[in-house]
Amino acid sequence: FGDERNYAGTSFVTLDMFGHYLYGSELLNITYDPTPLAQFATYGFDDEGLAAEKTYIIRNGILTTPLGGALSQARAGLPGVANARATSWNRPPIDRMANLNLEPGNSRLEEMLQAVERGILMKTNLSWSIDDSRNKFQFGCEWGQMIEQGELTQVVKNPNYRGISATFWRNLQQVGNTQELFGLPFCGKGEPNQVIRVGHASPYCLFAQVDVFGGA
């Protein structure tokens, strides 16, 4: 809707894209799920009273469901999720993330490494830059390790990668069969500002044709 464009920018995603837009390869499945007890941003109901449940945001690569609570669902005329959250009694509920997860696939890490002739394994996010339409991006990592002929070799410090959202995700080739849990206690949004917990879960993933740079 553009309600926050002066605070956090807009999005290249528009309402008419849901249900058919190819966001990534058929291996890409993204869920919004506030229900797992082990994750960082878990609840039973949002602050407008909607019951939390696991919902596919992207299924088999297709953009399916927007992140919007009851008010946004009424405005958009589309189904959404239970994500209207307030940080305290003196703030209104606004659309927020909870646990946004990349669902596991069928590949073992060893299989993914063996499929790579020359590449790099990156871990631990260090820096980020995203344009104001949430389309072009650049991320830096603390640590990387070269992959050569299917084998992990030398360690690389501070590698970076960049791309365009749909192009990047359409080049997803394999998804790992186990997830690692992540989370933050201080995700900020809104005016006046509201800080809440958010969570992520992700397996290892293999991408082709990624623009990698930097590192030492």
Which residues are covered by each model-predicted region?
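N-terminal small-residue-enriched
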Residues: 1-216
